[in-house]
Amino acid sequence: TVMLLHGLSSDATSYMRFTSIERYAESHQLAIIMPNADHSAYANMAYGHRYYDYILEVYHYVHQIFPLSTRREDNFIAGHSMGGYGTMKFALTQSHLFSKAAPMSAVFQAQTLIDLEWTDYHPQAITGEHTNVKGTNLDTYHLVDAAVAREETLPELFIQCGTEDFLYQDNLTFIDYLADKQIPYRFEPSPGAHDYTYWDKSIARALAWFVND
């Protein structure tokens, strides 16, 4: 089973509309869970819904009503852009649920999400009065440090990013940090921008990796 998280400009229907996710999932015999998280950064918002908790509720509810394995080795998580950020967040904080995680074109510097200007997007709804998220549970680097301190077995990581993506350098900086912390990862850059042309290819690679290696 794959928990698949959408990006800031997308919703729970986007992978069905803009990629061949159904065909890929069928070929690998995978169930795909696609929750909607609006513009939440997959966080428990200061002013808004508790989307972090909601994603976990969806995970457990779907596993209750469908005959899906709850074994860690049978459950994976992936997502792009804001969803890649969410993927990394859950990989680092809910490592007992997922054996593999595949962030694609991910936002690893949470401040990027907070500083971003987007239609109907209000980052203060996520952070409240705080404008700097460094050292908080929104900070991916802080979550890496916390996971290392807990000495947890983290999911295997397959990180992908297009070389023409505006987040490419962000990805390079983050994998350097993972290396410094001795956290294993696989990084696969390839030509592509921040769009569904790239994510159609990257999600196909991610699903194949989940089931084959």
Q: Residues of each region from the PLM?
A:
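Non-catalytic cap/lid and distal C-terminal segments of serine-dependent acyl enzymes
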Residues: 1-213
